[in-house]
Every structure is written in C-alpha cells, then in structure tokens.
Amino acid sequence: MNVTSLFSFTSPAVKRLLGWKQGDEEEKWAEKAVDALVKKLKKKKGAMEELEKALSCPGQPSNCVTIPRSLDGRLQVSHRKGLPHVIYCRVWRWPDLQSHHELKPLECCEFPFGSKQKEVCINPYHYKRVESPVLPPVLVPRHSEYNPQHSLLAQFRNLGQNEPHMPLNATFPDSFQQPNSHPFPHSPNSSYPNSPGSSSSTYPHSPTSSDPGSPFQMPADTPPPAYLPPEDPMTQDGSQPMDTNMMAPSLPSEINRGDVQAVAYEEPKHWCSIVYYELNNRVGEAFHASSTSVLVDGFTDPSNNKNRFCLGLLSNVNRNSTIENTRRHIGKGVHLYYVGGEVYAECLSDSSIFVQSRNCNYHHGFHPTTVCKIPSGCSLKIFNNQEFAQLLAQSVNHGFETVYELTKMCTIRMSFVKGWGAEYHRQDVTSTPCWIEIHLHGPLQWLDKVLTQMGSPHNPISSVS
C-alpha cells in the first residue's frame, strides 16, 4: 500500500500527527489509533496544539495531554484492546514496545496511567522506558567461616526435608494482597508464615481484592501493583524503582577489600530457555529466548518466529487422549515478559495456568513450593532480579550449600489447563499433561560464578586450603 492511498481518507490533523510516527509497520492500525485520538482531543481546547508541540519539540517541557479513562482502563483500536499510553508511546516513540511493564511516568506528569484518575495522560514524552537496575556485585569471602574439618554435606542432602509432601496452592488474585511496607519480608533462612492453606489466604494489614480501589481488579494489561504499597510516599503511582544500594551487602569494617572477591551480574544473550514436557517426558528441543517478550502457545507457526514457542508443532508417540485434549485447550497460552530485571507471566489462554516460582513465593510470604493459579486475563510477576540479588548476597555468608539451594529459585515450572498440589488430585507437576520448565540464564550463570569462587562443599575454602 502506497502513502497516497493510505492517506486518501484521512483528515489534515491526522496526517500531521502521523508525520511523527515511528517505524513502518502496521500503518493502518496507527492511522486508526491517531484518528480515534484526534476525535477525543478536538473536544478539548488546546489539546491538539499541546500534543503537536510535544511531538515537534521532544526536548522541551510540555503539558499533559489527556483523554477520559475508560471503565477497564483500555482503549480499543481496530479490534485490538490496549492501554492508551502504551498505544501512543508505540506510535510516536517506541514501535517495539510490548507492554505497560516497560513504561514509567515522568515526575512532571500530573495524570499518569497508574494514578487511576478520571483522565489519563497520553503524551508520549511524559513517559520513559524502564531500564534494568544495576545489580551490585556479590562479595564472596576469600576465607571460609566454617571449620575445614566440618563437612556440611549431610546438611546439604537434607535441605529439602522441611518441604511438604505435596505443594500448597494459591489463586491469583484472591490469595495475593500487597505485601506490607518492607519489600523483602523474609530472610533466606526464615519460615513462610503466610503459607496459603487454601486459595482464600490473605495478608494482614493489606486491602482485600474486593476493595474497589484494589489494583487487582484491573485487567492484565494494567500496571502491576507488585512490590510497594500505595501508602508509601515514594510511589504514588507505583513507578519508582527500589534503591539498588539497599541490595549491596554491608561488610564489617575490619574486612578490607582484599578479603572478598566481587562477582558481578552479566546479562546473557538468551535470558531464558524453555523446555516442554508431557507428564514426565521431555518433548522436543529447548526454546532459547532472545526477545524480552515471548509467547508460549498451543498453535503451529511454520514461519519459525523467534518470539514464539509453538507447542502445537511438537509430536510425541507416547501421547494419550488426556494430553491431546489438554493441548487443544492451551490456545493462546502464556505471554512471558522480561522487563527491568523482572519476569511477568500473563495468561492469554481461556484456561488457567499454574506456576511454581520460589522467587514469587518468597516475595508473597508463601511456602517455597506453593503453586499459584493465574486465571485467564491476569498477569503476575514471577521473578525479581533485585530480590534474588539480595538473597544471594546474604547467602554467601552461610556457605556453599545455602548458595547452591538458590539454584531452585532460578527454575520456574508452569502447567497449562491442569493444576497440581494439595487441592488437586495431581500431586506433582510431572503428573500434569502439559507443562514447561523455564530456566533463567542470568541468575543461574551468576550463581555458577559465585559457587566457583566459593569452592566445593567437599573442600570448603579456608585459610589453609
């Protein structure tokens, strides 16, 4: 389609605004999005002029350009629903923008999307892209705190003995409330007092999910309430990042830098790999994710899209009727985002997905092996690099085995359609018909480097080794 035919029925105002459009994909969709916006802005005196000023002078201060917030917060453009600030940031600034998780409002914005006001600002220059936080290096002591004659191998073997025979269950959002004001409620060796005995467990001193102001009432494509409560003065819109300095391990003054080895985090080429299983059988090759936005669905995609892991393509001679039926219900599956050092899972399937993430469970105060149900249309943060960094920094002072135990946190298991755990007749993930295992490469490689620096559990590092 040439430019002449594209603009043949567009108004002069829409033509002008499309002149600042970024990228060359989805021309017709962008035109419809801008046309819908122009119709709204024409009702407000000076709004069109303010938007044109912002687009033509990106480095100059500009005012909010607002439209009324819809009931569910989303805007429909040509059969596709999305959040308005995401739509217009995609049109005029970042064509590769995948999700609201990647955006943060600037301080000058009076009507940011996350503030839940009647008007929402769509000025693309009132938002910035989230950057991954810089994780402080882990400082590994050069000398062991342990007696070299004392072996921790027996303790190492028994680390999992306190785990229940089968995992407990929790349902999002019913079992999930905002954690209390401390973003990291537990130490790595603490118990999990808020373990959900059932899907109705709640947190003390936090709003229930039925509260009209609860962020969990919002659709999956809205900003996650996540890690900081609304009463915290630094996060009116939940947008401020945690101070990475709080992650830095504090060293006793008598320890000088020569007594520790700094091990830094490095972002790998592939942020994760995904392996698909049917019952206890691995099916097909591992999928290596290079894009920060990955779809795992039940369809077939002969184009070999690098952003999609299509389970419908995979064959298995041992497949039974239960597996076949479950595969038919995977549908659109799950959307995995890796943004700003955090991993989110959004259930796009009509059926629920079930997630076992120790990092997510730690954040919410659940038992480590709890399985969380994510219904259709909901999204949940399932891993946080900063919390992992804090745990790793603490664990190096407790020995090799404690650090090694964190490898379990770097693997996330997720089943489609059928759940497992105490509330289901399937007790283990290997009893579910269709499931995936997600390996987080960055945290795993970081752990590997720290463990290499520490030495082996059979021969702890010491002043005489």
Swiss-Prot record:
Its main location: cytoplasm. GO terms for biological process: anatomical structure morphogenesis; BMP signaling pathway; bone development; cardiac muscle cell proliferation; cartilage development; cell differentiation; gamete generation; hindbrain development. The modification Phosphoserine is found at S463, S465. InterPro entries: Dwarfin (IPR013790), MAD_homology1_Dwarfin-type (IPR003619), MAD_homology_MH1 (IPR013019), SMAD-like_dom_sf (IPR017855), SMAD_dom_Dwarfin-type (IPR001132), SMAD_FHA_dom_sf (IPR008984), SMAD_MH1_sf (IPR036578). Phosphorylation of the C-terminal SVS motif by BMP type 1 receptor kinase activates SMAD1 by promoting dissociation from the receptor and trimerization with SMAD4. Phosphorylation by ERK2 MAP kinase in response to EGF or HGF prevents SMAD1 nuclear accumulation and transcriptional activity in response to BMP. Dephosphorylation, probably by PPM1A, induces its export from the nucleus to the cytoplasm. Dephosphorylation is inhibited by association with EGR1. Ubiquitinated by SMAD-specific E3 ubiquitin ligase SMURF1, leading to its degradation. Monoubiquitinated, leading to prevent DNA-binding. Deubiquitination by USP15 alleviates inhibition and promotes activation of TGF-beta target genes. Dephosphorylation, probably by PPM1A, induces its export from the nucleus to the cytoplasm. Phospho-SMAD1 is ubiquitinated by CHIP leading to disruption of the SMAD1-SMAD4 complex. Residues 271-465 form the MH2 domain. It comes from the Eukaryota. Zn(2+) binds at C64, C109, C121, H126. Keywords: Acetylation, Cytoplasm, DNA-binding, Metal-binding, Nucleus, Phosphoprotein, Transcription, Transcription regulation, Ubl conjugation, Zinc. Residues 179-210 have a biased composition (Low complexity). The modification Phosphothreonine is found at T322. GO terms for molecular function: co-SMAD binding; DEAD/H-box RNA helicase binding; DNA-binding transcription activator activity, RNA polymerase II-specific; DNA-binding transcription factor activity, RNA polymerase II-specific; I-SMAD binding; identical protein binding; metal ion binding; primary miRNA binding. SUPFAM superfamilies: SMAD MH1 domain, SMAD/FHA domain. Transcriptional modulator that plays a role in various cellular processes, including embryonic development, cell differentiation, and tissue homeostasis. Upon BMP ligand binding to their receptors at the cell surface, is phosphorylated by activated type I BMP receptors (BMPRIs) and associates with SMAD4 to form an heteromeric complex which translocates into the nucleus acting as transcription factor. In turn, the hetero-trimeric complex recognizes cis-regulatory elements containing Smad Binding Elements (SBEs) to modulate the outcome of the signaling network. This is Mothers against decapentaplegic homolog 1. It comes from Bos taurus.
